Amino acid sequence: MGQKTNPNGLRFGKFKKHFSCWYTENKNYSHFVKQDIFIRKFLMEKIKNVFISLIEIEKDNKETVIFIHYLNFSKFNKVETNSEKNEINLFKLKNLLLKSLNSFFNVKINFNEFIIKLIEIENPILDVRFIANDIRYKLEKRMNFRKIVNSTIANIINKGIKGIKIKLSGRLNDAEMAREESFREGKVPLNTLKANIDYFHCTAKTLSGSLGIKVWLNK
């Protein structure tokens, strides 16, 4: 069963904390869920100059705290760029978010009740979301999928992780027939909850169709 369900869902509470942490009465539950979805979608659309890996939301009776895990491309690529373009203007972002929330949900949220905190990713090559999106970007640039995966595994496997598994599906390299290709290095035991498995999937949009990308990382 471990290979037929989302590995993240099985491990919440043991190795992972939930991406949304709050408690409310039943009558407000759906409203809070919709609000979380709106916040994540809004932030992902508005923040284009850095890579957003994860958005965590914590709420209590007094305030809402949003943790944005991000990667600054200029630091990762070690290229001197305009620093203003690679920074997140928290004040402006917070104002836009509150205006959108108040308008969409017809509520009045105080500016001081909302806190946005930035957490920079220290080691992006060990971030499963960055790995999957990096593969997606290269596939959309029509690079050979085997070269992409082999270089990805070579960069990761000696960085302190126990194993990695990558699965690609679709019309790979513009083939006439869709197929599935799997790559594994090290140990990725999906049938035990003792393993700290991080998982992410995304889709690459290419001229030959959509390509599915799944990445498992055993830390």
UniProtKB/Swiss-Prot annotation:
**Which CDD domains does the annotation name?**
KH-II_30S_S3 (cd02412)
Q: Which family does this protein fall into?
A: Belongs to the universal ribosomal protein uS3 family.
Q: What is this protein called?
A: Small ribosomal subunit protein uS3c
Q: Which UniProt keywords apply?
A: Plastid, Ribonucleoprotein, Ribosomal protein, RNA-binding
PROSITE patterns named in the record: RIBOSOMAL_S3
What is any one GO biological process for this UniProt entry?
translation
Name a single GO cellular component.
plastid
Task: Please give the start and end residues of each transmembrane region.
Answer: none
Query: Main site of residence?
Result: plastid
Q: Which GO terms describe its molecular function?
A: RNA binding; structural constituent of ribosome
On assembly, the entry states: Part of the 30S ribosomal subunit.
Q: Where in the cell is it found?
A: Plastid
Give residue ranges for domain KH type-2: 39-111
